[in-house]
């Protein structure tokens, strides 16, 4: 029986063509043992990527280029493995697998310790594998009990939202810097490179419990789970273990399964304490995979489809203290650990540990590291290797402009010439890149704004007050042009009330011109507002009562009585006291007028200013005139 093309829908037609062998097979479809169809252009990219991968494998076999796994071992990234070295090596040679590492947002910033398991992910991405970073928005509500005798204090909902938002954008910034580092080191990005920052709340918030229990619970035996050291120690020596803590490694394993079947993530990389969770995760993925009830969706097992993983070593400094903890943690948030302090932290590393840190925390080729250590050994007092380490780490965490600027600032402060092998220090080209960060640039929840502003003023004024716009009119334009975004639950409607806001699953929706009272629909837990402009300019704002705001003594841009009027009165006071000359006051006024200039096509009439501002302006101009010509004030002359 034949069918005409018009008698079936497009989806069925594609399915029939695929089943008939008329279409190619994707990477994940091969893993599942079924075919999917792609268009000819997309298929050409897949074919080229596969050909490039096979060519790369041949070069590795011939010894022309180094195997990525061998590089991991050489640089010291590998501690314990789930799967043998040879199995992992063969898998990475023949298959473009994906790898991930997970981070629970239990604190508002990543620290140097988090960077170590991220480095192999970054390396794999540069070598053509998929690199994923997972934020545990769901698992953070439970808390990882590994190596703990006392349960974690539950996070407040607003704290979790703040932590999740800040870490998400720290990871995005890190990935942008990784792209920059790849270009520096001569890696040519191709179509097959894949990376992502994901949040496990995305699937846990819609996952039926019965599916987890049926596909996972039936086959996971209690004996092995109870025999884990974490469980035994917490139950015998600690405060006991809750059921939610007991299921934490299973939740982590399900995360892996979700990315395994959806994205081909076959490897997990974790910190030195995560080996037990990785082993449980391997077992979880296999169990859920084998319990797939739909034969069409079932993924075959075998060495080339089984999950693998490894842990990175525990780093300690020369004093035996856990790395990053010796003098307070070295945070990746520049408002908790400044670029200068982070640079200084690595400059202070001992000669005994600097070579190991260069291998672990930089993308420098081994020959460059060996050459730097040779130069360093000739005169250790110059700390050449330490400066190279500090420069590279700051470049990875904050970008290369920050690395150059910080090294030059360090040189200027201590008056010593800095020699960094292979680097010619330069000042950043753009003037704005040399400007110290403002507190308004920090995505901190202690950025507070009063309730009267959040609930009673336009969104344009809120953007101005939050430092995302230079004026209220610019904030208005951002809202009109949908150039700024507000934190909301995926699919959130402005007509809904704030009860639908989920504090562990956040997306951003474009800001529009809405009524002031509608801003309340975006408050998280009734007091937290998250705004964004561009890719990484984030404001996490806590709404406080007007009384609390007044007592704090803070002001915000555009606050009544604190803007132009305050500036005019300050200028008048300083002019009368002789602290400023008339010319300096004029220059300040000119700069202020330029900053507050209306947008093109918008006419601002003088009488739109308040009477107090017009009067203060006149008083200031009279005082300038008096200072310039001397004698009585113009007002007194006119009265006479």
UniProtKB/Swiss-Prot annotation:
Biological processes per GO annotation: mRNA processing; tyrosyl-tRNA aminoacylation
Give the motif span ('HIGH' region). Answer: 105-114
What positions carry the motif 'KMSKS' region? Answer: 322-326
Q: Which domain of life is it from?
A: Eukaryota
Enumerate the residues binding ATP.
104, 325
Question: Which GO cellular component terms, listed alphabetically, does the Swiss-Prot or TrEMBL entry include?
Answer: cytosol; mitochondrial matrix
Which cell locations does it reside in?
Mitochondrion matrix
Q: Does the keyword Transmembrane apply?
A: no
- NCBIfam families according to UniProt: tyrS
Q: What is this protein called?
A: Tyrosine--tRNA ligase, mitochondrial
Encoding gene, per UniProt annotation: YTS1
């Amino acid at each position: 029986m034949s069918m005409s093309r018009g008698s079936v829908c497009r989806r069925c037609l594609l399915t029939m063509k695929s089943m008939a062998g008329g279409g190619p097979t994707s990477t994940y479809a091969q893993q599942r043992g079924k075919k999917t169809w792609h268009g000819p252009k997309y298929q050409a990219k897949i074919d080229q990527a596969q050909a490039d991968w096979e060519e790369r494998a041949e070069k590795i076999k011939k010894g022309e280029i180094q195997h990525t796994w061998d590089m991991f071992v050489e640089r010291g990234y590998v501690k314990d493995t789930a799967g043998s070295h040879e199995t992992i090596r063969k898998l990475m040679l023949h298959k473009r697998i994906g790898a991930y590492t997970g981070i629970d947002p239990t604190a508002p910033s990543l620290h140097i310790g988090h960077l170590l398991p991220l480095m192999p992910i970054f390396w794999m991405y540069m070598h053509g594998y998929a690199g994923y970073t997972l934020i545990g928005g769901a698992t953070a509500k439970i808390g990882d009990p590994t190596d703990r005798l006392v349960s974690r204090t539950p996070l407040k909902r607003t704290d979790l939202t703040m932590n999740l938002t800040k870490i998400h954008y720290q990871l995005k910034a890190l990935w942008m810097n990784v792209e920059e580092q790849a270009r520096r080191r001569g890696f040519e990005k191709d179509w097959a490179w894949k990376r992502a920052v994901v949040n496990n709340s995305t699937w846990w918030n819609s996952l039926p419990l019965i599916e987890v229990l049926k596909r996972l619970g039936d086959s996971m035996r209690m004996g092995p789970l109870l025999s884990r050291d974490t469980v035994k120690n917490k139950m015998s020596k600690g405060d006991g273990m809750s059921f939610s803590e007991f299921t934490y490694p299973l939740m982590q394993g399900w995360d892996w399964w979700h990315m395994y079947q959806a994205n081909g993530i076959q490897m997990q990389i974790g910190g030195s304490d995560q080996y037990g969770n990785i082993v449980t995760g391997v077992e979880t993925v296999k169990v859920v995979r084998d319990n797939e009830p739909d034969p069409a969706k079932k993924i075959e097992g075998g060495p080339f489809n089984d999950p693998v993983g490894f842990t990175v070593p525990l780093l300690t400094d020369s004093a035996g203290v856990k790395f990053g903890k010796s003098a307070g943690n070295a945070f990746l948030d520049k408002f908790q650990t400044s670029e200068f302090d982070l640079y200084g932290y690595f400059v202070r590393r001992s000669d005994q540990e600097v070579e190991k840190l260069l291998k672990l925390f930089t993308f420098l080729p081994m020959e460059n590291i060996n050459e730097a250590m040779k130069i360093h050994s000739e005169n250790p007092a110059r700390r050449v290797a330490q400066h190279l380490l500090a420069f590279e780490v700051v470049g990875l965490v904050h970008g290369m402009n920050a690395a150059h600027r910080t090294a030059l600032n360090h040189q200027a402060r201590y008056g010593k010439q800095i020699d960094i092998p292979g680097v010619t220090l330069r000042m950043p080209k753009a003037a704005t890149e040399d400007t110290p960060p403002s507190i308004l640039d920090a995505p901190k929840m202690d950025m507070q704004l009063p309730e009267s502003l959040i609930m009673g003023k336009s969104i344009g004024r809120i953007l101005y007050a939050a430092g995302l716009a230079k004026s209220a009119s610019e904030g208005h334009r951002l809202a009109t042009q949908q150039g700024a975004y507000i934190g909301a639950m995926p699919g959130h409607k402005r007509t809904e009330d704030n009860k639908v806001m989920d504090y562990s699953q956040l997306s951003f929706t474009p800001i529009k011109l809405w009524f002031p009272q509608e801003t309340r629909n975006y408050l998280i837990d009734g007091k937290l507002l998250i705004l964004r402009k561009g890719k990484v300019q984030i404001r996490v704002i806590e709404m406080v009562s007007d009384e609390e705001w007044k007592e704090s003594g803070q002001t915000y841009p555009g606050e009544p009585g604190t803007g132009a009027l305050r500036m005019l009165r300050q200028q008048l006071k300083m002019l009368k006291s002789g602290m400023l000359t008339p010319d300096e006051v004029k220059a300040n006024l000119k700069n202020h007028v330029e900053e507050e200039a209306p947008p093109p096509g918008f006419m601002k009439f003088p009488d739109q200013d308040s009477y107090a501002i017009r009067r203060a302006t006149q008083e200031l101009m009279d005082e300038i005139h008096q200072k310039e010509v001397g004698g009585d004030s113009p007002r007194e002359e006119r009265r006479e």
